[in-house]
């Protein structure tokens, strides 16, 4: 039969009549093997050591221990020994660990204060009683900012031709030719993307504050102008001046290149000696910019809360060709005024999608910048469109976590204090640059009128990635102060290239007093993104692959490459009228008209796009855990900077109109 002898003492009768005794938890048998005594004597023996976690009971309830008769676990009748020990442990790895174990009679409170650092103060007194007070306070603020800027420029040229023919029935004859030059406009694309991601995590009994601000701006401009003048003089009684002027202007975040030709024919017949005085105004309405396609693209992408601005403008100026024939007898002036209707399809595709998105989560600072520059040049007659798309993608991620946890038991008899201070900083930086070039040429021939268009588009995109992480590890024991500062830095770069080519020709033949016209158009499109793809007219095939892998722990690097190519060609001829088109993995257009003997069209397209992407992270973490009475506030800052670089080239030759688009994406990620 079991017998309870008090203080948790249980005796059991053994089979042989002997008595076997057991003690409840917290007690042990005395030497007489019949009585139970408490295992723990009241002493100052437990000294705080550093752990990976701070444990502290904010309100300790225990009783002073003395040798005597116990009435229950944790309860003691003190016999005059009231001094005790407080074990206080400092902070390790952004976590303050304090273990306070109290055995004694009294109440306890533990105080932990953290303001960007973890400071733990533990005070206890014991004189038969133990008192521990504690408060945990952690404050944290994080700010994230991301900016992106992209610029692009493009140039184009055009030609205008004026022809004057003079025939004098006299002694002298003169033939003059006037040539005018029309202007094309290049393409510039600026894209700014700002993406900011911040994370603030606060765990513990208390309050936390996280504030993140992100801004992204993308701007691109391109301008091109051109003029052409032609003067013609015939020696004899007939003097003819022909002037052809063509101008084309395209402006936008992307600008298009346009060229135009103007042909004016003036025929003067003079009867008699030294006559043939006819003003053959070879107005060849020098159509500058047949189709000035200005394509401006500003793309800003992000996720979350933030602001992003993008501006895209495109203007196109178009003129046409006109032919005039005038005949006069004597000093009659035959003015052949050719009005050229410039089909200025100013497609200025100003895709100014300023979707500048900034995603912010939590606390910290992430800053990333990306720059992309794409240039395209188109030369020839007709219209060339080049677009350089630069995309700057900035991703900044910063996480600050502050946690204070206080758990455990307090065994305190006496007084002790402890202080732990932790400081950690993480910085991530990534830089990248991107350039893109594009060239285009176009030719047009015809006894009547011929136009040629060339388009070149180049885009460059680059992405830089930087990652940095900082770790702060602090160990403090009891009375004392520990301060640790850690920094981490990481950089990453990314590059991308893309090429595209396109060709096209147009010819026209006219005879008699009529005129023949021929037009040709060429367009090219190529895209190369991290996994590049592209399209071109005629037959254009673009392939591009890009891979961006980023790993960041303390130090992170990221690289990305992308390439794309596109080519297109087309030709067309007609007797009276005709059309031709070329098709491929893109678009091809053919236009033909003849108000004379024949006309023909041809298309050519080439575009290339390259994209490189890199990613980096910078991380700074401060963790404090606290359980008990008090407030916890976490403060931490992290900075991440990412810049993207990409390059792309595109060339296109052809007639009439070509459109090319190139985009570049730069991604920078910074985490703190």
From Swiss-Prot:
Residues 141-161, 171-191, 215-233, 243-263, 273-295, 303-355, 365-389, 425-469, 487-537, 553-617, 637-653, 663-672 have a biased composition (Gly residues). This is Putative per-hexamer repeat protein 5. PANTHER family: FIBROIN HEAVY CHAIN FIB-H LIKE PROTEIN, PER-HEXAMER REPEAT PROTEIN 5-RELATED. Disulfide bonds: none annotated. SUPFAM superfamilies: EGF/Laminin (SSF57196). Residues 390-424, 470-486, 538-552, 618-636 have a biased composition (Low complexity). Residues 141-193, 213-672 are annotated as: Disordered. InterPro entries: Diverse_Func_Domain-Protein.
């Amino acid at each position: 039969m079991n017998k309870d002898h008090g203080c948790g003492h249980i005796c059991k009768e053994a089979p042989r009549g002997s008595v076997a005794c057991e003690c409840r938890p917290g007690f042990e048998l005395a030497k007489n093997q019949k009585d139970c005594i408490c295992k723990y004597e009241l002493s100052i023996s437990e000294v705080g050591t550093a752990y990976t976690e701070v444990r502290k009971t904010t309100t300790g309830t225990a009783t002073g221990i003395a040798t005597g008769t116990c009435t229950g676990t944790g309860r003691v009748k003190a016999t005059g020994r009231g001094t005790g020990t407080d074990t206080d442990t400092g902070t390790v790895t952004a976590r303050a660990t304090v273990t306070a174990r109290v055995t004694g009679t009294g109440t306890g409170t533990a105080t932990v204060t953290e303001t960007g650092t973890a400071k733990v103060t533990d005070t206890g007194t014991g004189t038969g009683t133990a008192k521990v007070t504690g408060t945990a306070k952690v404050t944290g603020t994080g700010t994230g900012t991301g900016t992106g800027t992209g610029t692009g420029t493009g140039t184009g040229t055009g030609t205008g031709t004026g022809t004057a023919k003079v025939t004098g029935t006299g002694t002298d004859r003169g033939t003059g030719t006037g040539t005018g030059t029309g202007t094309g406009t290049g393409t510039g694309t600026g894209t700014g993307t700002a993406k900011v991601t911040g994370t603030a995590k606060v765990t513990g009994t208390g309050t936390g504050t996280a504030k993140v601000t992100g801004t992204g701006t993308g701007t691109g401009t391109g301008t091109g102008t051109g003029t052409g003048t032609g003067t013609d003089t015939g020696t004899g009684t007939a003097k003819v001046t022909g002037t052809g002027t063509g101008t084309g202007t395209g402006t936008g975040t992307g600008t298009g290149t346009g060229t135009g030709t103007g042909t004016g024919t003036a025929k003067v017949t003079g009867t008699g000696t030294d006559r043939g005085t006819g003003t053959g105004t070879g107005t060849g309405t020098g159509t500058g910019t047949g189709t000035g396609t200005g394509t401006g693209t500003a793309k800003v992408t992000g996720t979350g809360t933030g602001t992003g601005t993008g501006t895209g403008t495109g203007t196109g100026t178009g003129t046409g060709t006109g032919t005039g024939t005038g005949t006069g007898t004597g000093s009659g002036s035959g003015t052949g005024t050719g009005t050229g209707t410039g089909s200025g399809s100013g497609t200025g595709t100003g895709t100014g999608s300023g979707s500048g998105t900034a995603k912010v989560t939590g606390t910290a600072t992430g800053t990333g910048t990306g720059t992309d520059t794409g240039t395209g040049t188109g030369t020839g007659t007709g219209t060339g469109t080049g677009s350089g798309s630069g995309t700057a993608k900035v991703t900044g991620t910063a996480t600050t976590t502050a946690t204070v946890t206080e758990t455990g038991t307090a065994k305190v008899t006496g007084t002790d204090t402890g202080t732990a201070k932790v400081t950690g900083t993480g910085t991530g930086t990534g830089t990248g640059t991107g350039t893109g070039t594009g060239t285009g040429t176009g030719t047009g021939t015809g006894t009547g009128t011929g136009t040629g268009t060339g388009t070149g588009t180049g885009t460059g995109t680059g992405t830089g990635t930087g990652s940095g992480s900082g770790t702060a590890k602090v160990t403090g024991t009891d009375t004392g102060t520990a301060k640790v500062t850690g920094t981490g830095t990481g950089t990453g770069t990314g590059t991308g290239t893309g090429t595209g080519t396109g060709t096209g020709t147009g010819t026209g033949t006219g005879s008699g007093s009529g005129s023949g016209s021929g037009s040709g158009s060429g367009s090219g499109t190529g895209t190369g993104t991290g996994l590049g793809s592209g399209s071109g007219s005629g037959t254009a095939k673009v392939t591009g692959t890009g891979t961006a892998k980023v790993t960041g722990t303390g130090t992170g690097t990221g690289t990305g490459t992308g390439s794309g190519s596109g080519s297109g060609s087309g030709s067309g001829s007609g007797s009276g009228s005709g059309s031709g088109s070329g098709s491929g993995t893109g678009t091809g257009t053919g236009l033909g008209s003849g108000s004379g003997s024949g006309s023909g069209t041809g298309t050519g397209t080439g575009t290339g796009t390259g994209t490189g992407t890199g990613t980096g992270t910078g991380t700074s973490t401060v963790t404090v855990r606290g359980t008990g009475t008090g407030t916890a506030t976490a403060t931490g800052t992290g900075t991440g900077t990412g810049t993207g670089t990409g390059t792309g080239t595109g060339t296109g030759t052809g007639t009439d109109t070509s459109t090319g688009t190139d985009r570049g994406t730069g991604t920078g990620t910074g985490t703190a």
